[in-house]
């Protein structure tokens, strides 16, 4: 400081400028000291400063893997979307995903792993800290997909149960265990099952996590269930606000079944290597319950989950649907219309809720794609289709972010990593600044 004073005194014409410079330096240092990232509330006075937010964003900013214009892609600018799609075609074959061995190596030092991979390690607001969310995450392959999904939804106040398919490779299971071991609020389900597509085992995986999550000391109020091809399209803060607005109600697809879907519970199904239908007809549903259809995904209150596991009528329905086709697509939808389930909706068709009106999951179905001006609910998929569902491409991101859902399905970095990269960048920026890119 003495040398600065002598310098300023010697060049007295610069005195005012020198002291202004010193004041700016002192202010920046004081701001740095006030940016307490260990006890953080983005709504607090100190984090209203651009400096603190910039510093936090720089710490948590995800490394860009390509030079695409994510802001343009998010706004739906055709030039940016075209460049992103072309860039994806160029890099798709060259891109190397992280392997199980990579994660086993990275997680040898958990603190370094969490810092290097930019996990958010403190609640970003008091509102979020006081409203933890429970996750049931059912996965079976693609370790990088799982880690990126976990990173996108992770906050230290939430609680995460991971169900790993029992028939997944041993190296995959080891890598999942290694990742999970780095977080005190992430755990593997106590009971694992071998999941067969469209069979009861898919529901059982979620039920196993539900049981474990209810045993957790974390006072969560809502549960979201995910699979390995899901990704959030809202920040944790936005999710908390949406869940509070539900005020104890659930949100999941539940509609009167079309005639072609009723066969799913009219016949007995059995599992060999796959699920197959027998000629044996089933008895009617128990308690004269009315059947509804929906999908596997839910936004469900804690009370609803507790009743799923303990209510006698719910347990009878669970037993009855075990030998049906794709029971996850009618069990939750039917329970959501049962008057004895908390947060449910009445039976009347006016209370039907489509997947587009529910907030649980945003999906583009191939047979509904088309020209919006001619009545289609959404435009064509810019990625590819898998089992008649769009695996999103960069051209879908603008549309995705216009919707109110909490998560979307399906994403796959091997199909289009740019759409995921831009979505990750969007979510991280919005989590810190509260604004879009």
From Swiss-Prot:
Gene (name only): Gcnt3
Name recorded for this polypeptide: Beta-1,3-galactosyl-O-glycosyl-glycoprotein beta-1,6-N-acetylglucosaminyltransferase 3
pH dependence: Optimum pH is 7-8.5.
A cellular component annotation (GO) from this entry: Golgi membrane
InterPro entries according to UniProt: Glyco_trans_14
GO MF annotations in UniProt: acetylgalactosaminyl-O-glycosyl-glycoprotein beta-1,6-N-acetylglucosaminyltransferase activity; acetylglucosaminyltransferase activity; beta-1,3-galactosyl-O-glycosyl-glycoprotein beta-1,6-N-acetylglucosaminyltransferase activity; N-acetyllactosaminide beta-1,6-N-acetylglucosaminyltransferase activity
Chief place where the protein resides: Golgi
One Pfam family, short name: Branch
Intervals, Cytoplasmic compartment: 1-6
Organism encoding this protein: Rattus norvegicus
GO biological process, alphabetically ordered: intestinal absorption; kidney morphogenesis; protein glycosylation; tissue morphogenesis
Lineage of the species this protein comes from: Eukaryota, Metazoa, Chordata, Craniata, Vertebrata
């Amino acid at each position: 400081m003495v040398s600065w004073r002598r310098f300023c005194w010697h060049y007295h014409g610069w005195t005012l400028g020198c002291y202004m410079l010193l004041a700016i330096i002192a202010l920046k240092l004081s701001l740095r000291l006030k940016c307490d990232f260990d006890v953080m509330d983005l709504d607090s006075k100190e984090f209203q400063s651009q400096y603190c937010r910039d510093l936090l964003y720089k710490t948590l900013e995800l490394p860009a893997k390509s030079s695409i214009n994510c802001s343009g892609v998010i706004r739906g600018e055709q030039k940016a979307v075209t460049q992103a799609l072309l860039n994806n075609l160029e890099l798709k074959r060259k891109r190397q995903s992280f392997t199980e061995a990579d994660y086993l190596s990275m997680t040898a030092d958990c603190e370094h792993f969490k810092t290097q991979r930019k996990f958010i390690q403190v609640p970003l607001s008091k509102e979020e800290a006081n409203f933890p969310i429970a996750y049931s995450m059912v996965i079976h392959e693609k370790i990088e997909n799982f880690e990126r999904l976990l990173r996108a939804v992770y906050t230290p106040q939430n609680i995460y149960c991971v169900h790993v398919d029992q028939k997944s490779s041993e190296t995959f299971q080891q890598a999942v265990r290694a990742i999970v071991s780095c977080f005190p609020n992430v755990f593997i389900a106590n009971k694992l099952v071998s999941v067969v597509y469209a069979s009861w085992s898919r529901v059982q995986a979620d039920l196993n996590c539900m049981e474990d999550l209810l045993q957790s000391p974390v006072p969560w109020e809502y549960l979201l269930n995910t699979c390995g091809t899901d990704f959030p399209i809202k920040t944790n803060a936005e999710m908390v606000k949406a869940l509070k607005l539900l005020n104890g109600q659930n949100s999941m697809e539940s509609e009167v079944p079309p005639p072609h879907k009723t066969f799913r519970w009219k016949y007995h199904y059995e599992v060999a290597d796959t699920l197959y239908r027998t000629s044996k007809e089933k008895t009617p549903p128990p308690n004269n319950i009315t059947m509804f259809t929906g999908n596997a995904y839910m936004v469900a209150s804690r009370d609803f989950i507790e009743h799923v596991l303990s209510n006698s009528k719910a347990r009878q329905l669970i037993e009855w649907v075990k030998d049906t086709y794709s029971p996850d697509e009618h069990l939750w939808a039917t329970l959501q219309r049962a008057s004895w389930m908390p947060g449910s909706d009445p039976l009347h068709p006016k209370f039907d809720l489509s997947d587009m009106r529910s907030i649980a999951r945003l999906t583009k179905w191939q047979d509904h794609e088309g020209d919006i001006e001619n009545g289609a609910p959404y435009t064509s998929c810019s990625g590819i289709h898998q089992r008649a569902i769009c695996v999103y491409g960069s051209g879908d991101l603008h549309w995705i972010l216009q919707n109110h859902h909490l998560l979307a399905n399906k994403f796959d970095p091997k199909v289009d990593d740019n759409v995921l990269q831009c979505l990750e960048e969007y979510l991280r920026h919005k989590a810190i600044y509260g604004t879009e890119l």
